[in-house]
Swiss-Prot record:
Belongs to the IRF2BP family. This is Probable E3 ubiquitin-protein ligase IRF2BPL. Pathway: Protein modification; protein ubiquitination. Residues 94-131, 162-331, 502-544, 572-692 are annotated as: Disordered. Its main location: nucleus. GO terms for molecular function: transcription corepressor activity; ubiquitin protein ligase activity; zinc ion binding. It is found in: Nucleus. It comes from Rattus norvegicus (Rat).
C-alpha cells in the first residue's frame, strides 16, 4: 500500500463540508464528526444546531444527491434515526416509479439494433446511464429512489427563487435555494458588517458537552420538538436543543412554530406579518427592508397558517424578553436612586442637632470623616470606574448600635447616589464584568480611595474604614490614612444639590439664603416616582418642564457663584465665626444639578459668568498661613490678578482642591467670594495650600523654614509633591534621625511610596550628597 493510500485511508470526512480531513483536524465532541474549520466558522455554540439542520436536510433530500461521499460511519453509541411513516411512503413511491422507468429503458434498448464497437453519443445516457454517487456506495433502493426524485426536483428548481409551493400530493421534498440549502435553516453566510444570529449564547464547552452526550445516548430528552421541516413540507419535524434557541422561542407559546432567523436577517422589530389566505404555506421572508419580521408558517395548506415572529433588531439587538429585563433593571435603578436621595435629604436636614446628640465617639468619627470629603474612589478591578465619597452619617436601629453610612456618587458628576459601599461596588462590578447576577459581600474590599489627588497613592477603603470603625468601636486611623479633600473643577457641585429638586426657588444671588428643606423619607421617593409615572397630558408636561427650568435658572446664578464655599461647608468645615469644637452647620444644597457647569440655554446673560465666579473665589485663596510659625507666603500672580482689571486667562485658574494641613487638623475655614460681592463678610485664609498651581506659580519655598529655595537644588519628597525642603533643613533632619539607619521624609512623616504602604526613605548616596556641604548656586530672582 502506497503512502498516498495510507494517508487517504486515515482521512475522515467532515459531516458538514464532506471534505477529507486528517484525524488531528477533526473534532469528536459533537453528535457528528466535524472539522475544525466548520466549527470555527459556525461557532461552537451553534455547531450542534447546524449539524441537526444538515441531518434533516440530508434526510429530506435523500442523502447526498450531489454525488458526495456519505461521510464516516457514526461513532460508537450513536443510533440512527428511523424514517417517519410519511417519509417511508414517499420513498417507496419514488422507488416504484424509478423501477418502471428502468423497465421502459430496457425495453427501448432491446428494440434498438445493437452496434458493435460504437455507441452513439445521443443514446449514451439512455443506453448506459452514468452511475450516481448513491450506487457507488450500495445504498438501499428506497434511498436511491428518493435521491433520484430529489435530484429531479432540484434540477427544476435549483435556480428558482423564491421556491415554488409544494402540494400535498407530491413529494415532500422542498425546493432548494440557490446555495443548495433549503429553508431559513440553511444559514446563508452573513456579511462582514452584519452581526451573528440572536441565539442564546452559552459556554461552548457546556453546550457542546450536553448535546453530544444526549446524542450519543440515542435519546432526545430535553430537546425542543415540534419545529417544522426546513422545507416547509410534511417531512420530519426539527429537533433542536433548548440551549441553542433564543429566549423568545423558549418563553413563547408551545403552539407557535418558530425558527431562528438566518444570519443575514436585519431590521427592527415589527408587528407579525401573517401569510395571506391564498399564499400556500406562507413562505419565510428571508430578505427585505428593515422592519420586516421573519415569519414562518407551520402548515403548508392554504386554509390555515400559524405565524410567529422572530424579532431581531438591526445591529444585533436583544430579544424582547431581554429588553424587558433591561427596562425593569432601569426602573429599579431609578427607584433606588430616589430612595438614596431621600436618605441623603433626611441626613442633611437636621445634621447639626442630630450629630450633637450622638455619643462622643460617633460625633468625633463623623466630624473627622466629614472633614475629608469629597474624595475619589475607584473600583479595584477596573481603575477607570471612578466615584466620589461626599457625605457620612450614623444610623441606628432600635436596640442596635450605631453604624456608619456613607454616600457615594458614581459615576463622578452623574448625580447617581449610593448609600452603601456594597451598592456602588456591585454596580461597578456589573459595569466592568457585565454580570448582573452576582452580588458582592463587602464593598469595602473592592473600593480604593486616593489619599491625595494626583499622587497615585490609592489605598483600600476597608483599611480606612474597618469594621470596628464602621460600628464606632474604635476611632478613625491616624492622619496618615485620611484622604485629603479634592473637588473636581469639571463638576464642582456635589450630589447634595439633588435633594433640592422639590424645593422652592432660592433667594436672589448674593443673599446666601437657603431654600426650605425637601420632603424626607418615603415621601420624597414617592413624590419622585409619582412625578415620573403620572400620565399627564402633553400640555401640562410642557408647562411643568418650563417651570422646572425656570427654577433652575433662578438657582443657577447663586449656586455657581457660591459653589466652592457651599461644597466646603457641605464637607463639614467650620464656617467663619463658627466654633471649631462644635458640630458643623448643616450643609446647604448646591442646586438642582450637580454636573451643570454652564447656564441653561435660556439663562439670563446679564449676571456674572460662572468662570468669573470661580476665579473670584479662587483668588481669595492666594494667601496661605503657615501652621508652624505664621510667616505668610504670598502668591504674586494672585495679588497681581486682584490688583489689575485685566481679564484672567483660564490657564491661570487653580484646580479646585481643598487640602488638609500636615498636622491632621481638619478644621479648615472657608474663603468666601470677594468683599465686593459680599460686603459684610471678612476674608478668611485656609491653613495651607501647598501644591496648588497658584502657589507653584510663585517662588519655591521650603516647607519647614519657608525660605526661598534654590532654583535647581532642593530636596523633593517623591510621595507628596508639596514636601519641598532646602539642604540645611534636610541636613538637620538627617542628623536628627540618624544617618546610619532609615532616614525618612524631613517633614517628620513616613510618606508612603506610590502604590504601596512602604514609606519613602533616603538612599545612602542621597544622604552623603546632602551632608557633603552647602552647594553654592544662585537663588531664584524675585519676580
Amino acid at each position: 500500500m502506497s503512502a498516498a493510500q495510507v494517508s487517504s485511508s486515515r482521512r475522515q470526512s467532515c459531516y458538514l463540508c464532506d471534505l477529507p480531513r486528517m484525524p488531528w483536524a477533526m473534532i469528536w465532541d459533537f453528535s457528528e464528526p466535524v472539522c475544525r474549520g466548520c466549527v470555527n466558522y459556525e461557532g461552537a455554540d451553534r455547531i450542534e444546531f447546524v449539524i441537526e439542520t444538515a441531518r434533516q436536510l440530508k434526510r429530506a433530500h435523500g442523502c447526498f444527491q450531489d454525488g458526495r461521499s456519505p461521510g464516516p460511519p457514526p461513532p460508537v453509541g450513536v443510533k440512527t434515526v428511523a424514517l417517519s411513516a410519511k417519509e417511508a411512503a414517499a420513498a417507496a413511491a419514488a422507488a416504484q416509479q424509478q423501477q418502471q422507468q428502468q423497465q421502459q429503458q430496457q425495453q427501448q434498448q432491446q428494440q434498438q439494433p445493437q452496434q458493435l464497437n460504437h455507441v452513439d453519443g445521443s443514446t449514451k445516457p439512455a443506453v448506459l446511464p452514468a452511475p450516481s454517487g448513491l450506487e457507488r456506495y450500495g445504498l438501499s433502493a428506497a434511498a436511491a429512489a428518493a435521491a433520484a426524485a430529489a435530484a429531479a426536483v432540484e434540477q427544476r428548481s435549483r435556480f428558482e427563487y423564491p421556491p415554488p409551493p409544494v402540494s400535498l400530493g407530491s413529494s415532500s421534498h422542498a425546493a432548494r435555494l440557490p446555495n443548495g440549502l433549503g429553508g431559513p435553516n440553511g444559514f446563508p453566510k452573513p456579511a462582514p458588517e452584519e452581526g451573528p444570529p440572536e441565539l442564546n449564547r452559552q459556554s461552548p464547552n457546556s453546550s457542546s458537552a450536553a448535546t453530544s452526550v444526549a446524542s450519543r445516548r440515542g435519546t432526545h430528552s430535553g430537546l425542543v420538538t415540534g419545529l417544522p421541516n426546513p422545507g416547509g413540507g410534511g417531512g420530519p419535524q426539527l429537533t433542536v436543543p433548548p440551549n441553542l434557541l433564543p429566549q423568545t422561542l423558549l418563553n413563547g407559546p408551545a403552539s407557535a412554530a418558530v425558527l431562528p432567523p438566518p444570519h443575514g436577517l436585519g431590521g427592527s422589530r415589527g408587528p407579525p406579518t401573517p401569510a395571506p389566505p391564498g399564499a400556500p404555506g406562507g413562505p419565510a421572508c428571508l430578505g427585505g427592508p428593515p422592519g420586516v419580521s421573519a415569519t414562518v408558517s407551520s402548515a403548508p395548506s392554504s386554509t390555515s397558517s400559524t405565524v410567529a415572529e422572530v424579532g431581531v433588531g438591526a445591529a444585533g439587538k436583544r430579544p424582547g424578553s431581554v429588553s424587558s429585563t433591561d427596562q425593569e433593571r432601569e426602573l429599579k435603578e431609578k427607584q433606588r436612586n430616589a430612595e438614596a436621595l431621600a436618605e441623603l435629604s433626611e441626613s442633611l436636614r437636621n445634621r447639626a442637632e442630630e450629630w450633637a446628640n450622638k455619643p462622643k465617639m460617633v460625633r468625633d468619627t463623623l466630624l473627622t470623616l466629614a472633614g475629608c470629603t469629597p474624595y475619589e474612589v475607584r473600583f479595584k478591578k477596573d481603575h477607570s470606574l471612578l466615584g466620589r465619597v461626599f457625605a457620612f452619617d450614623a444610623v441606628s436601629k432600635p436596640g442596635m448600635d450605631y453604624e456608619l453610612k456613607l454616600f457615594i456618587e458614581y459615576p463622578t458628576g452623574s448625580g447617581n447616589v449610593y448609600s452603601s459601599a456594597s451598592g456602588v461596588a456591585k454596580q461597578m462590578y456589573q459595569d466592568c464584568m457585565k454580570d448582573f447576577g452576582r452580588g458582592l459581600s463587602s464593598g469595602f474590599k473592592y473600593l480604593e480611595y486616593e489619599k491625595k489627588h494626583g499622587s497615585g497613592d490609592w489605598r483600600l477603603l476597608g483599611d480606612l474604614l474597618p469594621e470596628a470603625v464602621r460600628f464606632f468601636k474604635e476611632g478613625v486611623p491616624g492622619a496618615d490614612m485620611l484622604p485629603q479633600p479634592y473637588l473636581d473643577a469639571s463638576c464642582p457641585m456635589l450630589p447634595t444639590a439633588l435633594v433640592s429638586l422639590s424645593r422652592a426657588p432660592s433667594a436672589p444671588p448674593g443673599t446666601g439664603a437657603l431654600p426650605p428643606a425637601a420632603p424626607t423619607g418615603r415621601g420624597a421617593a414617592a413624590s419622585l416616582r409619582k412625578r415620573k409615572a403620572s400620565p399627564e397630558p402633553p400640555d401640562s408636561a410642557e408647562s411643568a418642564l418650563k417651570l422646572g427650568e425656570e427654577q433652575q435658572r433662578q438657582q443657577w446664578m447663586a449656586n455657581q457663584s457660591e459653589a466652592l464655599k457651599l461644597t466646603m461647608s457641605a464637607g463639614g468645615f467650620a464656617a467663619p465665626g463658627h466654633a471649631a469644637g462644635g458640630p458643623p452647620p448643616p450643609p446647604p444644597p448646591l442646586g438642582p444639578h450637580s454636573n451643570r457647569t454652564t447656564p441653561p440655554e435660556s439663562a439670563p446673560q446679564n449676571g456674572p459668568s460662572p468662570m468669573a465666579a470661580l476665579m473670584s473665589v479662587a483668588d481669595t485663596l492666594g494667601t496661605a498661613h503657615s501652621p508652624k510659625d505664621g510667616s505668610s507666603v504670598h502668591s504674586t500672580t494672585a495679588s497681581a490678578r486682584r490688583n489689575s482689571s485685566s481679564p484672567v486667562s483660564p490657564a491661570s485658574v487653580p484646580g479646585q482642591r481643598r487640602l488638609a494641613s500636615r498636622n491632621g487638623d481638619l478644621n479648615l475655614q472657608v474663603a468666601p467670594p470677594p468683599p465686593s460681592a459680599h460686603p459684610g463678610m471678612d476674608q478668611v485664609h485656609p491653613q495651607n495650600i501647598p501644591d496648588s498651581p497658584m502657589a507653584n506659580s510663585g517662588p519655591l519655598c521650603c516647607t519647614i523654614c519657608h525660605e526661598r529655595l534654590e532654583d535647581t537644588h532642593f530636596v523633593q519628597c517623591p510621595s507628596v509633591p508639596s514636601h519641598k525642603f532646602c539642604f540645611p533643613c534636610s541636613r538637620e533632619s538627617i542628623k536628627a534621625q540618624g544617618a546610619t539607619g532609615e532616614v525618612y521624609c524631613p517633614s517628620g512623616e513616613k510618606c508612603p511610596l506610590v502604590g504601596s504602604n512602604v514609606p519613602w526613605a533616603f538612599m545612602q548616596g542621597e544622604i552623603a550628597t546632602i551632608l557633603a556641604g552647602d552647594v553654592k548656586v544662585k537663588k531664584e530672582r524675585d519676580p
